[in-house]
Regions:
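Primarily a LysM-type cell-wall glycan-binding module
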Residues: 1-22, 79-82, 163-177, 183-198, ...
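LysM (lysin motif) carbohydrate-binding repeats in extracellular/periplasmic proteins that recognize
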Residues: 7-47, 104-108, 178-179, 192-210
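Short, ordered, surface-exposed loop/turn motifs in non-cytosolic proteins
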Residues: 21, 93-112
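Extracellular LysM carbohydrate-binding repeats and other cell-envelope/extracellular binding modules
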Residues: 22-72, 206-233
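Acidic, Ser/Thr/Pro/Gly-enriched interdomain connector segments
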Residues: 90-93, 133-194
Length: 233
């Protein structure tokens, strides 16, 4: 079985589309269970891979089916579609409720679960500021979000696993606690970088620990509770 070395933007769903192998077959492969999801990597989400991750791609299995002679038979390969979830927050990290927006996937306007099923009407976020795009093609590369005169470009699948330093940095960036130019590969920032430590402290103060009773835990170091809270946000 061939091994694919992940690059920035790779997901199991994208690999499944390219290799014509169901994503569940790839993710559940014994080698990926032991080396990718276990070992030192401990990847927990098939849509979050780090460049350099080794992914075992199983060979296709031949399947036989019967059909009557002198008849026309149709065999349809089911598409594996994904879901893109976004959440809009204001400067105080409060959700943008019922905000009008348009979203485009690779330049094409798409409907969302929070709005109309057609693409001619502007949709709105829900009560938690959330946007959900269903039936997303696995190979989709970029989302363009327009709201309140702003346009935001998002590279789909580029967020690194939360278990990695770059995954922590990316989430702090998305939440507005840290600013760095995201490149390919994602920039390496030392965990002792003063700005990064300050960003982690700010996040811990707001979401993880009580500044009045747990001030000693607000260290700027990404502990397990901080990592879990970042993942939830």
């Amino acid at each position: 079985m061939p091994i694919h070395i992940a690059v920035q933007g790779d997901t199991i769903a994208k690999l499944a589309k390219v290799k014509d192998v169901p994503s569940k077959v790839i993710w559940d492969d014994p080698k990926n269970k032991s080396d990718l999801q276990g070992g030192t990597l401990k990847r927990t989400d098939p849509n979050l891979l780090l460049p350099g991750d080794p992914v075992e791609v199983p060979d296709l299995e031949t399947k036989k089916d019967s059909g009557g002679t002198e008849q026309v038979h149709k065999f349809k390969l089911a598409d594996e579609l994904c879901v893109l979830k976004l959440k809009l927050l204001d400067g105080n990290h409060k959700p943008h409720k019922s905000m009008k927006f348009d979203i485009f996937i690779d330049g094409v306007k798409v409907p969302t679960s929070g709005g109309p099923t057609d693409t001619t009407t502007t949709a709105t976020t829900n009560g938690d500021g959330e946007i959900e795009v269903k039936n997303l093609r696995p190979e989709a590369a970029r989302a363009t979000l327009s709201y309140e005169g702003r346009t935001v470009e998002l590279d789909i699948g580029w967020l690194d696993p939360i278990e990695t330093p770059s995954g922590v940095l990316g989430r702090l960036q998305n939440l507005g606690y840290y600013r760095v130019e995201m490149t390919d590969p994602v920039p390496v920032v030392p965990e002792t970088d003063p700005e990064l430590v300050g960003a982690v402290k700010a996040f811990q103060s707001q979401y993880v620990y009580n500044p009045e009773t747990e001030a000693d835990k607000i260290t700027g170091t990404v502990d397990e509770k901080t990592r879990t809270t970042l993942k939830e946000k």
